[in-house]
Amino acid sequence: MLKVFLVEDESIVREGLKKNIPWQEYGYQFMGEASDGEMALPMIRKIRPDVLITDIKMPFMDGLALSQIVTQ
């Protein structure tokens, strides 16, 4: 199973994605979530997910900056 981590600042969207996608049915394991890139980064470094789903516009650290740091 591939490990998935979700980063989204809108709690309604984050909860909707987390609860309405049958992750295991598609071969994914939902590993965690964060509301912005700054909060997500230490969690991502610890969990080391295979897939990162992130919003682009977020406070503190946006999804583009987060993706750039994670891929370095």
PLM regions and their residue ranges:
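Two-component/phosphorelay signaling modules centered on CheY-like receiver
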Residues: 10-32
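Conserved phosphotransfer cores of two-component systems
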Residues: 45-48, 69-72
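Non-catalytic signal-transmission and effector/linker regions of two-component phosphorelay proteins
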Residues: 1-3
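Acidic catalytic/metal-coordinating carboxylates
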Residues: 36-39, 62-65
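Alpha-helical elements of the RecA-like P-loop NTPase motor core of helicases
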Residues: 15, 41-42
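Receiver (REC) domain active-site loop signature in two-component systems and cognate sites
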Residues: 58
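Active-site residues of response regulator receiver
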Residues: 55
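Conserved sequence signature across two-component system core domains
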Residues: 7-8, 34, 52
